[in-house]
Amino acid sequence: MDKASITEGKPIRCKAAILRKAGEPLVIEEIQVDPPQAYEVRIKILCTSLCHTDVTFWKLDSGPLARFPRILGHEAVGVVESIGEKVDGFKQGDVVLPVFHPQCEECKECISPKSNWCTKYTNDYLSNTRRYGMTSRFKDSRGEDIHHFIFVSSFTEYTVVDIAHLVKISPEIPVDIAALLSCSVATGLGAAWKVADVEEGSTVVIFGLGAVGLAVAEGVRLRGAAKIIGVDLNPAKFEIGKRFGITDFVNPALCGEKTISEVIREMTDVGADYSFECIGLASLMEEAFKSTRPGSGKTIVLGMEQKALPISLGSYDLLRGRTVCGTLFGGLKPKLDIPILVDRYLKKELNLEDLITHELSFEEINKAFHLLAEGNSIRCIIWMDK
């Protein structure tokens, strides 16, 4: 009898990396993961990765989003262990991606080709579970609830995810590559292809050369962009960027008395056709906007402004035709578009291997935080069973 049939409908005891206090190392503890309820699936995590969003919430020590204890992690791949009632389209053994961005497949926006903003669910990122509010599926050794993280919580051997946040994928794709498609790569590629719709011969500038920014570069490279300018303070990112088609580099620390946008405009005659802000700083969003050409320049904001600061845009610049828009998850509908990305990878159209710079065991998860925080990794794969 396999383990799935033994554990189905019962709590599972497993290891999880728990954040008990802001900024402190995660603690690997034994926890209990309850069985899935209606519309939920319990997943065995195969591997997970670390995103800057995880680091942001790891440091967060106040406000409604700061909750302890908590299981972080949202970029991962797993296998279905068991399903709850009213679950269609998933079965034991399916390879799946848990995704923080929901798709209910019923609301006006999910049905429309114009947006990926699920109006049924996307406004709530405070709950533990999508349909059951603050009810948690995790308990520590003392029987106390552990908070979920943006409906995924992948820093655990098992997790429970609502079907609105779950995508079934082909088992042919390597699982480490698949994990990247659940957040960073999908966000960058989607922004380049679906939101910006970059044309051949375009000039592009990308602010921030982390995994999202490099995925943008890969996307515009495949669209035939003629000039791809990367902006980053870390000179090591420049060599990595070349593998994704970046042709020119700007280090803000070396711009002297000029602003970044002034340097970009000089490099591109009057400005870039497309500008992508992948960091999440209001000041850089403004610089990204000023870096684009009058008449048709388009700025896409992918980074989340951590302090929710406003940005200031010149009304005359808007009148002259420059535009700016934001995007969550690159404008992609997870259930519809992620399988397409998987297929393009399997057809060898996408270079994603170079995004993985480190691999660690689950017990080494705190090292992954330090590598990313210090700018020494792009993506670190954390293996649950190695």
Curated annotation (Swiss-Prot):
- Where, by residue number, does Zn(2+) 1 bind? 51, 53, 74, 183
Tree of life domain? Eukaryota
What EC numbers are recorded for this enzyme?
1.1.1.1
Annotated residues that bind NAD(+) are located at 53, 208-213, 232, 237, 302-304, 329, 379
- Zinc: is it a keyword of this entry? yes
Q: Which reaction does it catalyse?
A: a primary alcohol + NAD(+) = an aldehyde + NADH + H(+); a secondary alcohol + NAD(+) = a ketone + NADH + H(+)
State its location(s). Cytoplasm
- The name on file for this protein is Alcohol dehydrogenase-like 2
The upper taxonomy is: Eukaryota, Viridiplantae, Streptophyta, Embryophyta, Tracheophyta
